[in-house]
Amino acid sequence: MAKGKIVQVIGPVVDIEFPAEELPSILNAITIKGKSGDIDINLTVEVMQHLGDGITRCIAMSSTDGLTRGMEAVDTGSPIKVPVGEETLGRVFNVLGQTVDHNPAPVGNKEFWPIHRPAPKFDEQETSTQILETGIKVVDLIAPYSRGGKIGLFGGAGVGKTVLIMELIHNIATQHGGYSVFSGVGERTREGNDLWSEMTESGVINKTALVYGQMNEPPGARMRVALTGLTMAEYFRDVQHQDVLLFIDNIFRFIQAGSEVSALLGRMPSAVGYQPTLTTDVGALQERITSTKKGSITSVQAVYVPADDLTDPGPAATFTHLDATTVLSRQIAELGIYPAVDPLDSTSRILDPHVIGEDHYEVARGVQAVLQKYKELQDIIAILGMEELSDADKLTVARARKIQRFLSQPFFVAEQFTGSPGKYVPLKETIRGFKEILEGKYDDLPESAFYMVGSIDEAVEAAKKIKQEA
């Protein structure tokens, strides 16, 4: 293993000189161990540039406090390697694959994979498009997820992103037997801790590996932590032939960290100060998330949109890769309808009769048409009241309100808060329920019967109870 010495430290950027014939490759991990006063230093840096004269410019994965010129650095001969396999489940890791949950390190972990890996070749990829059933009515009906697809999750603070993420993890684990990997990229440490606590309480932690690189970490760690999580997910896909869920919260912070690193390396910025390699960086990550003939990685990515500007180069680079968008709406959350998914704003590439079938497509578009009409009538209702509407419009409003309530659903992971047992609704049942509402089969039932139930049969039962109590 080649040894070099530090010649310059500027914040998270470390320049290391190696013998010219032993220069480490780009993306290799280099370890620096030593003591500086009372501080024990154990730092990993990643090679980013060769400056000539045997000097490599590296980016640190943790704090560079205490580093001095002349300290010894050792080339590991490979990129950062992280543990993979079932031993990672139920644990919290950092970007280097070290456990940070204060429990003993995983015992018997045999395999370590490098975080920089090629994307699957064309001939390895699955060509057919299949729907991934989530058991969440509004998602399966309006904006269905494709197996091995990429989904953007948009929503402000407090509208239920985390609960939706945990429900997806729960349903994939129980119904598909699949594992999940959660990459926390550049978000609040408190949120990461809350997620871990909630997962532990709801019991989904044993099917999940958590990888965190929070906003207090140097940009190198935030830029690479998504790749650490992705590598763990790739093992479950390629070796265990699983259908894996990969959550990235937040994909924008990955781009932001890349832009910080780019500036630190002295590259000329492009539009709005982003790195010139923006589309390459995003593409290198997204192309590895796909279905192969062995298994699939379906990715749900929370997308922060700076200043709500969808044309910003950061989010715009992400949108080109997404197959579906799930938009959470504060207005719907205020009505008490959870999950607060906006059925008119959420989209999916596979909402196409050739992929999901004519029946599903017709029902989904029918539901959207009724809700859109209701939205248009709301101003009239607010000013003139329901009495001024025509009979046809009154019927549309009544059905729309039933549909709106029927899009709500009790979640398994929220059982201890709501007191209602969670419901997994198969896709066939979801389509049947909404189809029958659109056909007018339940026009005589009270709309409250449709709120927070699973299948349509439960709504009918709830209506009977309401009638008896009245």
From Swiss-Prot:
ATP binds at G155, G156, A157, G158, V159, G160, K161, T162. It catalyses: ATP + H2O + 4 H(+)(in) = ADP + phosphate + 5 H(+)(out). Transmembrane segments: none annotated. The keyword Transport applies. One of its GO terms (cellular component) is plasma membrane. GO terms for molecular function: ATP binding; ATP hydrolysis activity; proton-transporting ATP synthase activity, rotational mechanism. F-type ATPases have 2 components, CF(1) - the catalytic core - and CF(0) - the membrane proton channel. CF(1) has five subunits: alpha(3), beta(3), gamma(1), delta(1), epsilon(1). CF(0) has three main subunits: a(1), b(2) and c(9-12). The alpha and beta chains form an alternating ring which encloses part of the gamma chain. CF(1) is attached to CF(0) by a central stalk formed by the gamma and epsilon chains, while a peripheral stalk is formed by the delta and b chains. Produces ATP from ADP in the presence of a proton gradient across the membrane. The catalytic sites are hosted primarily by the beta subunits. Belongs to the ATPase alpha/beta chains family. This is ATP synthase subunit beta. It comes from Pectinatus frisingensis. The gene is atpD.
